[in-house]
């Protein structure tokens, strides 16, 4: 596997993020209630919480798929809107076009001599040998690797992950976690991962943020060396701390279904 070429130093790669008084309402329901966050460049942040707590809404605001009712979203000192070209979003569904071969899915929307870059991105995720196959021939984990390659080809500074591993089997999920972590360490982009899996959050993130009823209920630093030994006492203790806090919070109604964006409005991992 290769590393994409011409990468600046790690700490210069990621987008620094901040939210100030971030609020979002749907009708009479306030889903986010004044979120204040500061995320340094290159940090790996996991966002957890019960269904309906507002975590997916927060990610959609960061991706520009919804607009906040109030508050600010910043990339450094500038509006986050100015960093959209350097932002990519991955979903649980890889969203590959079945009528395009793997390499063409990676290079979707690009012009010029993009094929060598697409092959390089596929090699970085271990799928260079599948470049000329159809998506239907791939497993679920392989499709998510293609989606990740589709993000890498754009050399993003901010990668937003909305439950991208939720549909994978346990072993494939761990392999994908390790791949995402390795690529993050190589390229230094900022990562925000929304997940229901507390063990996943603690295993891969620098920091775990728990959203409770639209507010930050817990902001926990995961100060453990990498690579992390799964099953270690310290990892289990941190997982238990977050999980106990999640379980102590009563469930809320599901977040409202957002209006699906048009393909031209959405920057997937492509």
Curated annotation (Swiss-Prot):
It is a peripheral membrane protein. Its EC number is 7.6.2.14. Keywords: ATP-binding, Cell inner membrane, Cell membrane, Membrane, Nucleotide-binding, Translocase, Transport. Residues 248-270 are annotated as: Disordered. GO terms for cellular component: plasma membrane. The keyword Manganese does not apply. Residues 17-238 form the ABC transporter domain. It is found in: Cell inner membrane. Gene3D superfamilies: P-loop containing nucleotide triphosphate hydrolases (3.40.50.300). GO terms for molecular function: ATP binding; ATP hydrolysis activity. It catalyses: ATP + H2O + aliphatic sulfonate-[sulfonate-binding protein]Side 1 = ADP + phosphate + aliphatic sulfonateSide 2 + [sulfonate-binding protein]Side 1. InterPro entries: AAA+_ATPase (IPR003593), ABC_transporter-like_ATP-bd (IPR003439), ABC_transporter-like_CS (IPR017871), ABC_transporter_ATP-bind (IPR050166), P-loop_NTPase (IPR027417). CDD domains: ABC_NrtD_SsuB_transporters (cd03293). It comes from the Bacteria. It is an enzyme of class 7 (translocase). Belongs to the ABC transporter superfamily. Aliphatic sulfonates importer (TC 3.A.1.17.2) family. NCBIfam families: PRK11247.1. PANTHER family: ALIPHATIC SULFONATES IMPORT ATP-BINDING PROTEIN SSUB, TAURINE IMPORT ATP-BINDING PROTEIN-RELATED. The complex is composed of two ATP-binding proteins (SsuB), two transmembrane proteins (SsuC) and a solute-binding protein (SsuA). Part of the ABC transporter complex SsuABC involved in aliphatic sulfonates import. Responsible for energy coupling to the transport system. This is Aliphatic sulfonates import ATP-binding protein SsuB. It comes from Pseudomonas putida (strain ATCC 47054 / DSM 6125 / CFBP 8728 / NCIMB 11950 / KT2440).
């Amino acid at each position: 596997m290769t590393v994409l070429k011409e990468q600046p130093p790690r700490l210069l790669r990621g987008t620094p993020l901040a939210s100030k008084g971030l609020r979002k309402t749907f009708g009479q329901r306030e889903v986010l209630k004044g979120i204040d966050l500061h995320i340094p460049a290159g940090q790996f942040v996991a966002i957890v919480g019960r269904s309906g707590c507002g975590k997916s809404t927060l990610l959609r605001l960061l991706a520009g798929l919804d607009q906040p009712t109030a508050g600010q979203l910043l990339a450094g000192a500038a509006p986050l809107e100015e960093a959209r070209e350097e932002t990519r979003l991955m979903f649980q569904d890889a969203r590959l076009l079945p009528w395009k071969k793997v390499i063409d899915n990676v290079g979707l929307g690009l012009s010029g001599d993009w094929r060598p870059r697409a092959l390089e991105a596929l090699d970085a995720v271990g799928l260079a040998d599948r470049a000329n196959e159809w998506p239907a021939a791939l497993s679920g984990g392989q499709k998510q690797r293609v989606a990740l390659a589709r993000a890498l080809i754009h050399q993003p500074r901010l990668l937003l992950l909305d439950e991208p591993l939720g549909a994978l089997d346990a072993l494939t999920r761990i392999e994908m976690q390790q791949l995402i972590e390795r690529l993050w360490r190589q390229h230094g982009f900022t990562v925000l991962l929304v997940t229901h899996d507390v063990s996943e959050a603690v295993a891969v993130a620098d920091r775990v943020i728990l959203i409770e009823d639209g507010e930050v209920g817990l902001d926990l630093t995961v100060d453990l060396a990498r690579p992390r030994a799964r099953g270690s006492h310290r990892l289990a203790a941190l997982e238990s701390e977050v999980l106990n806090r999640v379980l102590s919070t009563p469930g809320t109604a599901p977040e409202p279904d957002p209006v699906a964006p048009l393909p031209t409005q959405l920057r997937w991992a492509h």
